[in-house]
């Protein structure tokens, strides 16, 4: 079972991706994790990408395509791809790779939330720069405001978590995803799930769909 999962900033797609990995034994491939890995290593590529993100801009397609395709070469089946493709050019790169290697996609799943929900979820995040602990000023606040419970370090707000940056990222997402959604809808594999509400409630909307696809693929392989 090969899945694409996407959604606006703060939609919970990464959280649900990890749940899908646990439930169905898929390999998780995240464009965000790959990008952050480069940034944390402070490679020349990572520094270049960090500059784009700090402005709320998308990283150029050529850079993202290289990162993702390189990772897919090590995992050709049973994967969930989080946050990619995000532009028509990335769709072309992915489709060409999948076609050349005889790989089929079973589902393009969008977890959707509105702009204000996106801003509330993202702009409220606070990160500990020392130990990496993550908090939210509303949903998961530290015991002492602004201070990490784990190590006592002053919490920070990431540059790309600021409200104005989040709104820009959201609007870029909506604009760029329109043709991508149209493409995968035409292929008959696109499904939108309402991402509003608590994580367990959203998961209840996702799981029946995945169970159906999982059983369908299981039966298909039995008859091959």
Swiss-Prot record:
It is found in: Cytoplasm. Gene3D superfamilies: P-loop containing nucleotide triphosphate hydrolases. The keyword Ribonucleoprotein does not apply. CDD domains: ADK (cd01428). SUPFAM superfamilies: P-loop containing nucleoside triphosphate hydrolases (SSF52540). Its EC number is 2.7.4.3. ATP binds at residues 10-15, 125, 134-135, 197. InterPro entries: Adenyl_kin_sub, Adenylat/UMP-CMP_kin, Adenylat_kinase_CS, Adenylate_kinase_lid-dom, P-loop_NTPase. It catalyses: AMP + ATP = 2 ADP. Coiled coil: none annotated. Zn(2+) binds at residues 128, 131, 148, 151. Residues 30-59 are annotated as: NMP. Its main location: cytoplasm. Residues 124-161 are annotated as: LID. One of its GO terms (biological process) is AMP salvage. Pathway: Purine metabolism; AMP biosynthesis via salvage pathway; AMP from ADP: step 1/1. Belongs to the adenylate kinase family. This is Adenylate kinase. It comes from Thermococcus gammatolerans (strain DSM 15229 / JCM 11827 / EJ3).
């Amino acid at each position: 079972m090969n899945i694409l999962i996407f959604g606006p900033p703060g939609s919970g797609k990464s959280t649900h991706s990890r749940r899908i990995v646990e439930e169905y034994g898929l390999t998780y491939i995240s464009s965000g994790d790959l990008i952050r890995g480069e940034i944390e290593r402070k490679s020349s590529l990572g520094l270049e990408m960090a500059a784009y993100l700090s402005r709320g801009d998308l990283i150029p397609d050529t850079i993202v395509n290289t990162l993702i395709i390189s990772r897919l070469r090590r995992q050709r089946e049973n994967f969930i791809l989080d946050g990619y493709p995000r532009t028509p050019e990335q769709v072309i790169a992915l489709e060409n790779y999948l076609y050349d290697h005889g790989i089929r996609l079973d589902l393009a799943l969008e977890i959707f939330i509105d702009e204000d929900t996106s801003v509330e979820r993202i702009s409220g995040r606070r990160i500990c720069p020392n130990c990496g602990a993550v908090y939210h000023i509303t949903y998961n606040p530290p015991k002492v405001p602004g201070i990490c419970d784990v190590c006592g370090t002053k919490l920070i707000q990431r540059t790309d978590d600021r409200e104005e940056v989040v709104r820009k990222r959201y609007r870029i997402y909506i604009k760029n995803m329109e043709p991508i959604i149209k493409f995968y809808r035409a292929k008959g594999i696109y499904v939108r799930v309402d991402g509003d509400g608590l994580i367990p409630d959203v998961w209840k909307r996702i799981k029946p769909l995945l169970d159906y696809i999982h059983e369908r693929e299981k039966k298909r392989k039995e008859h091959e």
